Amino acid sequence: LFREFQFDDGVPDTNRLLTPEQIAEMEADTTIRWEGSEVEFTRALIDATLQHAGYSETLIDRYAQNWDIERIALLDRILLRMAIAELITFPEIPPKVTINEILELAKRFSTDKSNLFINGVMDSVYEELQKAGSIQKTGRGLLDS
């Protein structure tokens, strides 16, 4: 999980992968029951997000018109990075599903206008990735945006 937290030393730590112990502490109030395949997918998505972080930041900066990338809400940047990584890395997930899921997460966990901002950026990013041939989807119906 990516989060911005302030740990015992009082220093904010951004974009840190949490340890299993830290996750367990966060889940103390709300238990999350993960299936094996969900854990596997989550780890793969985190790895892909980290692997493509530089490229994702370049795309976000390019299409977040009139926004300083450092002023974009941290959660919005993380969601955008995750969506870009998922588009590039997971051939079995339709682009429409990736974008819709990220928008739902933004509506639920970020600011009131985050989903509109993310949708605008992702439309442009998706178009560029598609033109560049960076999105390789396999399976029936997966090439539709």
Tell me what each language-model feature is.
Residues L1-S145:
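N-terminal interaction/assembly modules
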